[in-house]
Amino acid sequence: MSEPPDARSCQIHVDPLSGRSVFVAPARAQCPREEALDVCPFCAGNEHLTPDEVLRSPADRALPWGARLIPNRYPIVVDHRFSPMPATPGAPAAGHRPAHGVHDVIVESPRHDRSILTVEAPHWRASWELARQRLEQLALRDDLVWGGLFKNSGRAAGASLDHVHSQLVALDFVPPPIVAQLAAGGGDRDPFTRIIAVAEREQRVVATSADLVALVSPAPRQPLETWLVPRRPGPWFHDAGPSVVAGLADLVREIVARIERAAPGADFNWWLHQAPFRASSGPEPEAGRRPREGGVPPGWRWHLEILPRISPLAGFELGIGCHISTLSPEASARRLRGV
């Protein structure tokens, strides 16, 4: 529907003292707010108000859609393959560079559902399969290094539209949290087995499925912070089989329902972390084949982190860099299990 964003509009600026990266994305200031819209661009029948879809479910366009994946009209990063940087003399200014990547939106229901708890189960599961397919596509591009998912649900979590949706990003660098997680295990070749075992011993497991364990974080940044961890090692979500993807969708909905009962009205974020697309140097995989697992600890696993927004981030969190939780991990788990 819309023209590709100007590649100059999205940049990454680096703080020279901390090394912290900041994405400058002027188009984000134009994101519409729910209260300012006459019609919702994500509802069925309003497809002309969004960019052309990349993926849909079902794939047959003769059938009504249940979930759609579309380019974000107000991106954080710009795909320079479709919006190339203009040729300008000289090197980029010190301290910043173009923000290259892919930024998509996953519309999780054709109805104007405001909560994932009211989305029809087939549509909800289909939205996760679209995300998996899209990450699988992007992993084959040699200009992208990492990809993941995130959701903002509610105003306190950063959502501007109520219609249920999540977002997918693929970047040309590995985000600092992923670097830190890969390094945190040290010599532990299977850190997630230990994480699950300790959670079981400390009674922090909230719920389980055939393929996943939902546990309260050992160091929650907010009360009720919950992680969903696969039982079996696997660094990439886009390699997950259909039963794992469907099981993840169902378990996410169960945990969000528990959070809603334990803290009614709480907004929340979640994000899915996985390993870099190509995690080691060496020969590239054959065309059409997924990148190798090398360079990632054998037991490393993609996982989902759900963070309720119960307390605001204040000066201590922002200035000191540490979080404060008013509820212990064990108490959070007891509360979630009890509702």
Across the structure, where does each feature detected by a protein language model lie?
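Domain-length cofactor-binding catalytic modules of enzymes
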Residues: 271-273
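Active-site microenvironments that recognize anionic phosphate/pyrophosphate groups
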Residues: 1-163, 169-237, 243, 256-261, ...
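Functionally critical, mid-to-C-terminal surface segments that flank or help form catalytic/ligand
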Residues: 252-253
